[in-house]
Each structure stands twice: as structure tokens, then as C-alpha cells.
Regions:
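Accessory cap/linker subdomain of secreted extracellular hydrolases
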Residues: 160-293
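Short beta-strand/loop motif that positions the catalytic acidic residue
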Residues: 304-306
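N-terminal cap/lid segment of alpha/beta-hydrolase-fold proteins
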Residues: 24-54, 274-277
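Histidine-bearing beta->alpha loop at or near hydrolase active sites
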Residues: 333-348, 360
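Conserved alpha/beta-hydrolase "acid-adjacent" motif
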Residues: 311-317
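Gly/Ser-rich "nucleophile elbow"/oxyanion-hole loop immediately N-terminal to the catalytic nucleophile
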Residues: 53-54, 113-134, 150
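Short beta-strand element of the alpha/beta-hydrolase
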Residues: 56-65
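Primarily recognizes the serine-hydrolase "nucleophile elbow" in alpha/beta-hydrolase
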Residues: 127-182
Length: 379
């Protein structure tokens, strides 16, 4: 149960950052507090934290997928993950976006509006970095590819940076397989009921079904390819909500498993013969492809950091983006690193700080990080 609840907590942290924790201070912590500005721009709440000893650099932070609206109250201390940027002298600007869910379309515009507002109020930063977690990694890549004259570099943390149709179709394929093995546990897949929420109760119901049929659960896990049965219930619960939200967003069904051959499980023949097949509606599928399909035209350094045991956004999926930049001739501007952990976006604040230091050194001194494990702290 703790691991299932942990994934829900991780999703919350990805969306808005967790509350500051005194047990995990930055090694570079400032003694002077930052000034905080909050407000609303075109329906999107925002927050700007400006350190007292500002170095005139800016980090535009992109939060991840949010089921409920993100709150950015000025009275709360900045999340320890983001405090790493402040403690290095950078201002942090974060938008709550004007929509929840797969708000890639809105997030790009909302963050750009906030960045422009920051410049009007505080002057043009000497350099601007993009950074984000999960879906925020998607927005980080989009920002770097579309505005290389604006951003000096980017940091993608557990980012969903492969093509969205590839990522999201895989999520749907898992649900269709789950429905085959565990009929009646979920509601309809097309359309997903609008009132469904990925709560602890829904997770518990799915987890109980998995526990009752361990062979079927193992087959499902092999299809998914990452994590374990303890986290699979959380993944199914979240994916079911995500699929419904995207159906409502696109005013149709963007998902297709009609031509998919499931592999990896022992009973693949029976599954492929018996699973219910669905075809996507063209306009709905086109929306997902538009938001987003990376071009690979990466003209600024991008460091991606992933945890090897991420059950929600598999670490292997980031290689799709590595191939995109390779095809476009910009492979020198992309580096993938990892930490050997299980969970979605379970980096410590210090790990985020070290990754950001690597990115800054890459931009400032042309010290390209080495692909592989995140280097340990210097002693």
C-alpha cells in the first residue's frame, strides 16, 4: 500500500512541488529570503521567487500533469526541489497553467506569457533556463526547440519527452490489456466516465483485482515492462483517468490498439485474440500528435535525468528523443543521465541541484556532461 500511495504523492509533487522540508537543505542555502510575487495572467496563476542576491538569471519551471488545479500561494515556502535554483542565485518563475491535465498546449503559451511579464517587471535576464518534471519535461523540450534564442539550456527531470502519441498510446494499450484480464474492474474505455478520479479507493480496487489473479497480473506487468505489481495498480488508475481526460480534451477518441500485436507475456496468442480493439478518430489523434511531436531540432543543451525504475514514464522511452535529435543532426546537444531508483520523479533536491550545475557548466564552459549515472557530489 505504501508504494501505491507513494506514486500518488509523487504525481502531486510533480504537479506543484512538495512543501519545503528542513531535513534536506541545499548546501548553498542563502540566509536572505527571496521576494515572492503571485498573480494571474490570462487565467493562469503564477509565482515568481526572486533571491535577494539575484544573479540576473532565470529558471522557467514547468510543472507536470495535474489532476486538480495547481496552487501557488505566496505564503508557502518554495518547494525544496526548486529552492536549488534560488540557492544558486537564479529567479524562478512558475505558471500553474490555465488548464489541468495534458495541458501542453496551454502550458507553452502560459509560460511564455509569464516569461515576458518577468522581463517587463525585472528586466531582461542575462540568461534563461527551462526546467520541468514529467509533462514539464515535454514543455521543456518544446521551449528549447521552438525558442532557442530565448533559452540557454534545459533540464528535463523524469520527462515525458518521447512523442506523445507513442507515450499515450502505450498507456491506452495497457488499459485494454487490463480490461481483458480483469473484465468489469474498470468502466468503459471509450469513453471513460467523466466522473472517474484516480483516488486511493480506485487504486485499492485495482490492486485487489491484481492480487486475486497473480498470473494475469504478471502477464500485464510483462506487457508494461517496468515497475512491479505493487505499483501497477497506481499506473492503471492514473492511466485510466488520463485517457478519459484526453478523450474529453480532444472531443473524441485519440487511442488505437486495433493494429497492435501484444508481446512479452506468456499467453500472447490468447490476449491478442481476445482483447477488445479500438480505432482512433483522426481529429482526436491529430491533436495528440500536435501536442507533442518533437522535431529534434535542438540548438541548445538539454540534460535529461531519469530514475531507472520509473513505473509511470519508463526511462527507456527517453531514447526516442535521443534518436530524434540524432536524425536531426543535433545529438551533441542532448545528454541522458540516470539515478538508480524506483518511483516517478523521486530525485532528492540535491540530485536536482547537481544536475543543474552540470547543465550550467555545459552552457557556460562547454563542459558537456557524460551520459550515464548522475555523478556523485564533489568532496
Amino acid at each position: 500500500m505504501k508504494r501505491r500511495i507513494g506514486l500518488l504523492i509523487a504525481l502531486s509533487c510533480v504537479a506543484c512541488g512538495c512543501s519545503a522540508q528542513g531535513s534536506d537543505p541545499s548546501p548553498r542555502a542563502r540566509t536572505q529570503p527571496a521576494s515572492v510575487e503571485t498573480g494571474t495572467l490570462a487565467g493562469a496563476d503564477y509565482r515568481i521567487d526572486l533571491p535577494a542576491d539575484w544573479n540576473h538569471g532565470l529558471v522557467v519551471w514547468f510543472h507536470g500533469y495535474a489532476v486538480t488545479p495547481v496552487q501557488l500561494p505566496a505564503r508557502d515556502p518554495i518547494a525544496p526541489q526548486l529552492r536549488q535554483f534560488l540557492d544558486r542565485g537564479y529567479a524562478v518563475a512558475q505558471s500553474a497553467y490555465s488548464a489541468t491535465g495534458w495541458a501542453v498546449e496551454q502550458g507553452v503559451a502560459d509560460a511564455e506569457r509569464l516569461r515576458a511579464h518577468f522581463g517587463e517587471k525585472h528586466g531582461k535576464p542575462r540568461e534563461t533556463f527551462a526546467a520541468g518534471m514529467s509533462m514539464g519535461g515535454t514543455l521543456t523540450v518544446m521551449s528549447l526547440e521552438s525558442a532557442p534564442d530565448t533559452y540557454a539550456g534545459g533540464l528535463s527531470l523524469c520527462g515525458a519527452i518521447e512523442r506523445s502519441d507513442s507515450l499515450l498510446q502505450r498507456d491506452f494499450a495497457l488499459l485494454a490489456a487490463f480490461d481483458y484480464y480483469f473484465p468489469g474492474v474498470l468502466g468503459p474505455l471509450v469513453p471513460v466516465p467523466a466522473n472517474y478520479l484516480p483516488t486511493q479507493a480506485s487504486e485499492k480496487q485495482i490492486a485487489s483485482a491484481l492480487a486475486a489473479k497473480p498470473d494475469a497480473a504478471e502477464s500485464l506487468l510483462r506487457i508494461w515492462g517496468v515497475g512491479d505489481v505493487a505499483t501497477l495498480g497506481s499506473v492503471v488508475a492514473f492511466n485510466y483517468y488520463e485517457v478519459g481526460e484526453l478523450q474529453r480534451r480532444t472531443h473524441g477518441n485519440p487511442f488505437n490498439n486495433a493494429d497492435l500485436i501484444y508481446t512479452g507475456n506468456k499467453d500472447a496468442f490468447a490476449l491478442n485474440a481476445g482483447v477488445k480493439r479500438y480505432r482512433a478518430e483522426a481529429a482526436a489523434a491529430a491533436y495528440i500528435a500536435r501536442w507533442y511531436t518533437p522535431s529534434g531540432k535542438l540548438l541548445r543543451p538539454l540534460l535529461a535525468l531519469h530514475d531507472t525504475g520509473d513505473p509511470l514514464v519508463p526511462a527507456t522511452a527517453a531514447f526516442d528523443y535521443a534518436l530524434a535529435v540524432q536524425r536531426a543532426g543535433h545529438a551533441d546537444n542532448f545528454v541522458q543521465q540516470f539515478v538508480n531508483k524506483e518511483g516517478h520523479c523521486v530525485f532528492t533536491p540535491q540530485e536536482i541541484g547537481r544536475a543543474f550545475d552540470e547543465l550550467v557548466a555545459w552552457v557556460h564552459d562547454n563542459k558537456r556532461p557524460v551520459s550515464g549515472p548522475l555523478p556523485p557530489p564533489e568532496r
